Amino acid sequence: MLIKLLTKVFGSRNDRTLRRMRKAVSLINAMEPEMEKLSDDELKAKTNEFRARIEKGESVESLIPEAFAVVREASKRVFGMRHFDVQLLGGMVLNDRCIAEMRTGEGKTLTATLPAYLNALSGKGVHVVTVNDYLAQRDAENNRPLFEFLGMSVGINLPGMPAPAKREAYAADITYGTNNEYGFDYLRDNMAFSPEERVQRKLHYALVDEVDSILIDEARTPLIISGPAEDSSEMYKKVNKIIPHLIRQEKEDSDTFQGEGHFSVDEKARQVNLTERGLVLIEELLVQEGIMDEGESLYSPGNIMLMHHVTAALRAHALFTRDVDYIVKDGEVIIVDEHTGRTMQGRRWSDGLHQAVEAKEGVEIQNENQTLASITFQNYFRLYEKLAGMTGTADTEAFEFSSIYKLDTVVVPTNRPMIRKDLPDLVYMTEAEKIQAIIEDIKERTANGQPVLVGTISIEKSEVVSRELTKAGIKHNVLNAKFHANEAGIVAQAGYPAAVTIATNMAGRGTDIMLGGSWQAEVAALEAPTEEQIAQIKADWQVRHDAVLAAGGLHIIGTERHESRRIDNQLRGRSGRQGDPGSSRFYLSMEDALMRIFASDRVSGMMRKLGMKPGEAIEHPWVTKAIANAQRKVESRNFDIRKQLLEYDDVANDQRRAIYTQRNELLDVSDVSDTINSIREDVFKETIDAYIPPQSLEEMWDIPGLQERLKNDFDLEMPIAEWLDKEPELHEETLRERILAQSIEVYQRKEEVVGAEMMRHFEKGVMLQTLDSLWKEHLAAMDYLRQGIHLRGYAQKDPKQEYKRESFAMFAAMLESLKYEVISTLSKVQVRMPEEVEAMEMQRREEAERLAQMQQLSHQDDDAAVAADLAAQTGERKIGRNDPCPCGSGKKYKQCHGRLS
């Protein structure tokens, strides 16, 4: 009550921010007559004038009124479009490191030209981030004439572009691209073997369109560049045959693992657990299939990989549904983005889940992958000096933007008042009753000539509604992941009188629905339209437009509530743009996933008390409130998951930054010999310490062991025993110095043969390759640590602190291994002539190019980990402590990855 009173007196924080910015808008408006008087050349010259002022020390912020006035005037001349005052406000919000919430149809694309131009003046580059390639290309081409008129260059960053084209795109003043491509380029740059292979500049200013979709919905999705691990497709097929014999428990009891069924499903956490009965049955079936020996347990250490296969297969069957989570097309399993309803070609689930789904669907099983480099969007976008974003729906997530990205959310007012009617939800007992009610509503609306957009949350649901509409004889268009090729055409004409369009999640569609349809699309369909034809098309459109306005504008039907209120608001936001009339209503049933998991008992009880008859709906503020609370619960849970993921990923992020900084410094220098010499001293000191403890008696020395180690690991034949026999007075310090001097001498002889320049080149290559190889193994080890760290909670230890402590110890061990591996490799290398070295370098470059083209894999799960090659090998056979480590380091297992197990 008190807060409401204070807000009334002083205004909200949002009001105060806008009040401050409106003063600048008045200044910009006052400059308009002055700008109109300038010739085109004088207006263009303003860009160079601004750049010169910045170079002299003037701040970018001080240029806002003039720069925005210049862009507005240029837009009038190039596009015939003048920025509204609210768009100027939006531009200032975006320059202010904030999230601008601007409603659909308020011209976010044109608004973005203001801060993009302003921040590009410094010459450091601006990255405009969109959710898909189509929008990146469309926005870049639409805005290119304006930016080029003002003397700014525009680049487009698309997947599959060759490195020179990417470098050119990044060198432009303003670059358009997708969040995925910016992230993957960052990872690829940090896998480059020469400075020339890198494409990105320093990350300066990112302007993110549909910011909620990228920074929140996809925050749990790490970007991963992966390489193939070993083939285990047969095992997936064998385990897949067993799963249909298992029965799901009717009442879920994931805490005690007791019950009548063989496995329980936790739909909230998206996890599957075997019950005790299920474990007994699956062990029997595995023995029958000859996969496991009689008397063995599925939980024994030797069967860890088998347990991994069983869990993946169970999840594939119990949690992942065809035409909801994925589609099968041309013999391939393609993931469907749960937030946008789009297919994600080339993306694969990790942890063997994708292979398990392929086995379930009977398509070809592709190899598992091993992580080579990864980063989450949360950490990638925090690398920018300055970050801002815009969306139609951000206010519900304002707390998350503030706490994770330190971005305030500012709601920008609409240019015209919003007059859409949002009708209360209708709740039915069953799915069938709900669908029938939707069909009746559509019949009624279309009879009056009102266009209807039906939003569904999955392909499966959109096809159910489509079948019912076909039965009822209602013409309609379906827009989902299966038919996305003609997406823009369908959306453009969704405002036609009496048009019915069914669409899976409308988030990120990026195309406005014009009432009466799009006359521009009709003109574009003609080969060479005449002035008369265009005039006739416009006149016909005006008649249709007026008819739709009279019928009440676009009507939105939601077939069920989404987990997030924000995505419901996005669907509603397709109607009522720019002050147009419109309406919306959600139809729900007690069988909907959200209602079943979160709101069922309370609302079901309420409906029973009211004595509901079949086909009757409940429409009450209490129900709407209960549903909103259920959505808040889910949002809160998802926020906690993202926050926790970030806390864990921050540990890896600190290590990633340290490694990438070191790697970039290494790339930028041509001579690393000082580093090599320093490392050599450390490595030989530690090696000798292991056999000749410092300040120890000679009786404690293990000279044969030291000689063998020097021979095996450094290819050095040193008669240390002979030296000691011939020179009894040889003490420890002198002996150490002699061993180091001998090793340097042998190395220098190699350098004389191959030449100093070639040796420097080779040293740098060895350091980079060794660093990459160890970092790859470290990522796999971190994944395994992350998977099991929660169990430390049972020992009354804080899993996060344990994870930090152990991952730091692993990181320190990796750096020690790096020193050792580099010196060992350089010592053991066989000297070749320069021509041979060049040929080897050529081969390495080809391999690096192949690696860069490798499949890019994305996790879908909250904290899913990657099944790495090393684990696959160690899981299948017992490795002796003194055997060579399977990672290929050349060290004994106990001295390498045996320490981790």
Curated annotation (Swiss-Prot):
Monomer and homodimer. Part of the essential Sec protein translocation apparatus which comprises SecA, SecYEG and auxiliary proteins SecDF-YajC and YidC. ATP binds at residues 87, 105-109, 512. Keywords: ATP-binding, Cell inner membrane, Cell membrane, Cytoplasm, Membrane, Metal-binding, Nucleotide-binding, Protein transport, Translocase, Translocation, Transport, Zinc. One of its GO terms (biological process) is intracellular protein transmembrane transport. It holds the Pfam family SecA_PP_bind. It comes from the Bacteria. It is found in: Cell inner membrane; Cytoplasm. It catalyses: ATP + H2O + cellular proteinSide 1 = ADP + phosphate + cellular proteinSide 2. It is a peripheral membrane protein. GO terms for molecular function: ATP binding; metal ion binding; protein-exporting ATPase activity. The keyword Metal-binding applies. Zn(2+) binds at residues 885, 887, 896-897. Its cofactor is Zn(2+). Part of the Sec protein translocase complex. Interacts with the SecYEG preprotein conducting channel. Has a central role in coupling the hydrolysis of ATP to the transfer of proteins into and across the cell membrane, serving both as a receptor for the preprotein-SecB complex and as an ATP-driven molecular motor driving the stepwise translocation of polypeptide chains across the membrane. May bind 1 zinc ion per subunit. Induction: Repressed under conditions of excess protein secretion capacity and derepressed when protein secretion becomes limiting. This is regulated by SecM. Its EC number is 7.4.2.8. This is Protein translocase subunit SecA.
